Structures are given as C-alpha cells and as structure tokens.
Amino acid sequence: MCIRDRFCSVRKLDVLQELLEDSGITEIMVNGWQHIFVEKNGRIFPWEKHFTSPEKLDDVIQQIAGRCNRVINTLHPIVDARLDNGSRVNAVIAPAALDGPVLTIRQFPEEPVTMERLLAYGSVTEETLRLLIPLVRAKYTILIGGGTGAGKTTMLNALSAFIPEDERIITIEDNAELQIQGIPNLVRLECRAANIEASQEITMADLLKTALRMRPDRIIVGEVRSDAEELLQAVNVGAEGSMSTIHANSCRDMITRLETLVLMGINLPLPAIRRQIAAGFDIFVHLGRLRDKSRRLLEICEIDGIVEDEVVLNPLFLYEEECGLVQKGKLKHRSKLERAGITLEDGL
C-alpha cells in the first residue's frame, strides 16, 4: 500500500477517496465491500477497486455517520448524511441490507450548473428559456418534477440564478445540497433527524412555519415530501415565486403526488387539496432521462384553475420523440408578468 492509500485508509474514506476527488463522477454506489459502481457522464459502470474487507466498509460508514452526529446500528440500520463537500449520503446495513452494507453517495459539482450549460447539453431549448426566465423574474410559483437522477435539483439551481438579487430567499432542505448564488439576503435552513431517543427532530413542517415568520420574498424547498400540506399553506399565503421539486412521472402525476403527500399528513377532502394546488402553483416543469441516458426537459404546463373539482393543466411545451420539445400552447395567466412590467416574446 502506497503512502497516499495508507493516508486515505486512515484519515479519509479509504478506497472511495479517489472517486470523491473526481468532479466528473455524480454517483458512487457501494454494494457490499467487493462491488463498487460509479456514474459518470450519465453512464453507470463497475469500478475495478474495492474495500480490503467488510470491516473497512463498516468503518467508513460509521465514520460518515459520526461526522454528522448520526447513529447507524442494527436497531437503526438506515442513515442519511452529508459529507464535508456537500455530497449526499445514504447508508444501509444489516438487517435491512441482506448482502452486506450498501452505501450511495450523490456528488454535486463544485460550481452549480448554469442554464447556459444546460442549453449546451441540450437539456433545455432557447424557446423554453424565453418562457421560464421571465416567469421566474415575475414570481410565478414553480414546481419541478421528475424521477431519481432526472436533474431536478440542477434545474432548480439554474432557475434560481434569475431571481432578482434584492429579494430575501429562504431555502429549506432535508439535506443541504442547493447551490443558490447571487442572492446576498439568503437564509439556508436544514432539517434534522431525530436522535436515538426519538427527540430533537427538526421537520420540514417546523422550518416552513419558521420561514413564514422570517419575511421571505420566496421560499425554496429542496424536495416536497411528507410535509406537503405546509408547503401548500406557504405558497397560498403570499410566498409567491417559491420553487420546489417533487418525484413524479409527468406534470399530471405531480398533482397526484401532491395529493398523496398531503393526505399522508392531514385528512382533507380531495377537492380542498386540489383547490390549494391550483391556487398556490402557477407552473409545473417535468424532467426525465431518455433512452440514451441524457437528461431532458420533457414538459411544461400552466395550472389553469379548477373544473368540476379537477385541476386543469394548460400544456405549453411537450417533448416528442421525433421532434424534441414542441410548443403546444400559450400562457394564459399573465397578471404577474404585467405587475412586474415583463413582456413575453410573441408566440409564448
């Protein structure tokens, strides 16, 4: 073992340190001590190196958990954490993991991906940016949906670059990973999991209630989960221009997911939930991964009110296999644009 390997084994994260120092790697997947996979440039492949023993992988997992004041053991075999560089970590051990400890690390770029880079990658088009950028500036409330690894957080970071710098922004996340830049009046809040005595938890609901008392111009929530009813309350009581992400398979599915998440926390009639969704959100953006593993903006829809207790969507752009992103309609609700003194280009 060379001096560097010995140092990484003792002071760093052992064999994973080399991967963590590669800015091109977006995901590190450890399936037991002998099998490591990485994602780079949208493709997943096995790595030739592995841990020297099961105990060494256990040590690394305990080291990560300890740095974040988290506990992982047979009674609490699952932990979410964050590395010093901001990477998001999920670890699972026995008895939940049947074939050895599982460690997954999501890495984020040192510098946030800009909208210019997304345009160069082909993830977005100039036509969609001519719509989305004015909507962000005019404080349209936007929800970004997609599957795991679709680029939701990347899109949220890129859109946030167009928020006027004189606004007060509050961000709320389970694990801090947003890279909001150019906003001097920025407050970052992070949830905290309960300790082993099931106390001292700080939930998304706690932080959303707190954020509303902090005079926000906008609230940016990293991901909507079980406390969705609190986010609906926030966007319905004046936090216009707020943005968030959600796991969903289409713009229509984003409505169903919101309904389900709200019902997990509070028993409300579906028509009441749908009215809150229609009143609180203005725009849905859906992202996905194509068969070639590339990430693409697939759909943009405008929330067009309620008809017979159903949320009505006005499709603005839709991805088609042969044509790419195709404009399907024009924005109907323009009052926020008018108040902001912003005019969309002709045809949008």
What is the predicted role of each segment?
Residues E48-T52, E116-V124, N185-I202, R218-V221, ...:
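Flexible beta-alpha connector loops of hexameric P-loop NTPases
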Residues P109-A120, N157, A161-K209, M254-L258:
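P-loop NTPase switch/communication element
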Residues D22, H35-A138:
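P-loop NTP-binding catalytic core
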Residues K152:
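Conserved lysine of the Walker
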Residues I144:
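Hydrophobic anchor at the beta1->P-loop junction of P-loop NTPases
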Residues R4, D292-L348:
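NTP-binding/hydrolysis catalytic cores, primarily Walker-type P-loop NTPases
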Residues R4-F45:
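N-terminal anchoring/assembly modules that precede and organize ATP-driven motor systems
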Residues E173, I180-Q181, A211-G305:
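Conserved P-loop NTPase nucleotide-binding/switch module
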